[in-house]
Amino acid sequence: MLIFPLINDTSRKIIHIDMDAFFAAVEERDNPALKGKPVVIGKDPRETGGRGVVSTCNYEARKYGIHSAMSSKEAYERCPKAIFISGNYEKYRTVGDQIRRIFKRYTDLVEPMSIDEAYLDVTDNKLGIKSAVKIAKLIQHDIWKEVGLTCSAGVSYNKFLAKLASDFEKPHGLTLVLKEDALCFLAKLPIEKFHGVGKKSVEKLHDMGIYTGQDLLAVPEMTLIDHFGRFGFDLYRKARGISNSPVKSDRIRKSIGSERTYAKLLYQETDIKAEISKNAKRVAALLQDHKKLGKTIVLKVRYADFTTLTKRVTLPELTRNAAQIEQVAGDIFDSLSENPAGIRLLGVTMTNLEDKVADISLNL
């Protein structure tokens, strides 16, 4: 007996676009001498005493087992000839904006998931093109021609399958999953490839003898619910290719923030305040991009011993003014008890967000 009703809308046309090794690809585009060489976006451990982590890397570096969140030291040990680049996040954001403008030519139903990936609902698109595959190919062509980068695309009738499809053939691939092929497509996938199934859930599923989509499909609904609660029903639906989550062009954001981890610890107040200023300006720019205002400013400080402090101040009025955000974040820092340990991370976040209701100038 089904505990929750199964409703499977297969009429939609959803595309998931995922840029290929985005940060590294931008660096290769701007410096062709990097092509064919292992490129790592992160601090060079030879310059930082082994500190720092990998933000991302290109496909050449991935051949050595390098991946995001790996320590820069380990990345260097795996591939001493790797080229380390600190990264230019303002440049990446500008390129990301350029790519999103391309998406908007085809549909306004664009849901960015990060700077380098997005869902598009092209069921009713601006150009009246019936084939979602054709639109995906046009987008790939436009991005290559105008931005000089490649992307992978997944096409299906829901977001879950479209994302799995975009991961199936990288880089610069295009995979279509039709409703009649969905069960076969899912059956062959390792369960850890299922989007939304975290590491702990994977371990639990493995303990139950579930390793593939085919294994998951054979498990009764009540068994999954007994082991995972409501998430068990989600797993039951995923195994059957069912997901009716809409593409939300205006995703509700609860906060907008900017934080940075430092390979070299910060001790001097002038350096600390300068980094707070950079984060504040980044937050103000993001608020501008998303047409949001905020009331509560949060400062996050992590020290060398990994002690982490967060403190917030709620303003009387909404703002997205960079100077005001910087001032308040700086005042919050001044109010913290002195800690002789150096600072390894600083973050500034704005919460209590509302849509822009007035033309408030952005002072950078």
Swiss-Prot record:
The record marks 23 as: Substrate discrimination. It catalyses: DNA(n) + a 2'-deoxyribonucleoside 5'-triphosphate = DNA(n+1) + diphosphate. Its cofactor is Mg(2+). It is an enzyme of class 2 (transferase). The active site is at 117. Disulfide bonds: none annotated. Pfam families: IMS (PF00817), IMS_C (PF11799), IMS_HHH (PF11798). Keywords: Cytoplasm, DNA damage, DNA repair, DNA replication, DNA-binding, DNA-directed DNA polymerase, Magnesium, Metal-binding, Mutator protein, Nucleotidyltransferase, Transferase. Signal peptide: none annotated. Its EC number is 2.7.7.7. One of its GO terms (biological process) is SOS response. GO terms for molecular function: damaged DNA binding; DNA-directed DNA polymerase activity; magnesium ion binding. Mg(2+) binds at residues 18, 116. The keyword DNA damage applies. Belongs to the DNA polymerase type-Y family. Poorly processive, error-prone DNA polymerase involved in untargeted mutagenesis. Copies undamaged DNA at stalled replication forks, which arise in vivo from mismatched or misaligned primer ends. These misaligned primers can be extended by PolIV. Exhibits no 3'-5' exonuclease (proofreading) activity. May be involved in translesional synthesis, in conjunction with the beta clamp from PolIII. This is DNA polymerase IV. The gene is dinB.
